[in-house]
Amino acid sequence: MKFHCKPLHVLPFLTLLLLTLASCFGGSNTAMRNGGEVTGQRSSVPLEPTPYGMVEIKRGYLKVGLSENDSLWGLPLSQRDISVDGFWMDQTEVTNSMYRQFVEWVRDSILRERLADPSYGGDESYKIEVDKFGDPVKPHLNWNKPLPWRKPSEDQERALNSVYKTHPYDGTRMLDVKQMNFRYETFDYEKAALRKYRLDPRERVLNTDVNVDPNEVVMISKDTAYVNDNGEIVRETINRPLSSLYDFINTYIVPVYPDTTVWVNDFPNANNSMYMKNYFSSPAYNDYPVVGVTWEQAQAFCAWRTEYLLRGMGPEARYIQRYRLPSEIEWEYAARGREGHTFPWEGAASKNEKGCFYANFKPDRGNYTEDGNLITSRVGQY
């Protein structure tokens, strides 16, 4: 059975609806309700939730520099008063289990790419290239489809095994860390806001009496990275004429697996080979701080942590601050704990009346195990 609706009956209804909407949103009635006063637009803004595992560092100030003149050379002290806005900071160090989640995510993303590759069977369900209406979208991985660990086909098994290798001496199957590369992009909002980089030449100069050359070529630098035919990461900073917003996008590729050999290289003659083998990979050290991570890897972890959070937040993600490393001033401000204090505790002494250090200063000669630890301890223990 088909239903027909006459246009003649619809038009009066639409007209009435438009008049009603105009009455609701019209300026005259609003002005009458407010007595003609500008009271500001009211809108509900969702409160920013407390980030998991983080604490709020409230705004304040600190003095940066020497607090006393150099007694040897008599150099004048140099101090600066710096105001710091509030920010969130991790309550503890990033643990092995947290960073291992990052490494495994990178591994799984590589596997999904390969499972969708025709060289490994070409399962297109692991990569989304069209939306539900069949229109093309920016290709992205399908994280809703699980990896076929239990009963893989021959092609799938080749893909799953491609990120592992076998130790030539003891036959141990281990992750091929050289393949664990994380690619991410950042948009440089600060550079895009500078007037000299405005896409419209008329916006580059505030003085309207100054003539602006519309054909002026503005050069911009950006970071980019790619993997060459030998599997090596190539990082470049290129300069090119500014042409679009894409010129403010920087691309980075970072090998994310931590350097586990620091246990041997940084502590010679310490017999630390067992920590080199087990500290990062063993569940026994899940709650211990990750070590052997470079600044570039820490930046990549922040980018991944942001991406991971935004994917889980949905539309509310636009109100959430992105993860980043603290600045030098923010770190010092958080470490001091209080305004005007050299240390987070009262006074300028580094030891208490029993001779014990208040914090992790380099200790003197003595019994390093007296506090129950020889290497790093579980996070949050002190």
Predicted features, each with a name:
Residues 2-12:
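Bacterial N-terminal signal peptides that target proteins for export
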Residues 11-19:
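Sec-dependent N-terminal signal peptides
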Residues 21-23:
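C-terminal motif of bacterial Sec signal peptides marking the signal peptidase cleavage site
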Residues 25-34, 56-57, 63, 68, ...:
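Functional-site microenvironments in short loops/helix caps that host divalent-cation chemistry
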Residues 32-59:
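Post-signal peptide N-terminal segment of mature Sec-exported envelope proteins
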Residues 71, 109, 136, 162, ...:
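Coil residues (strongly favoring Ser/Thr
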Residues 88-92, 102, 108, 114, ...:
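Conserved hydrophobic ligand-interaction patch in extracellular adhesion modules
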Residues 95:
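Acidic-aromatic/histidine active-site loop/patch
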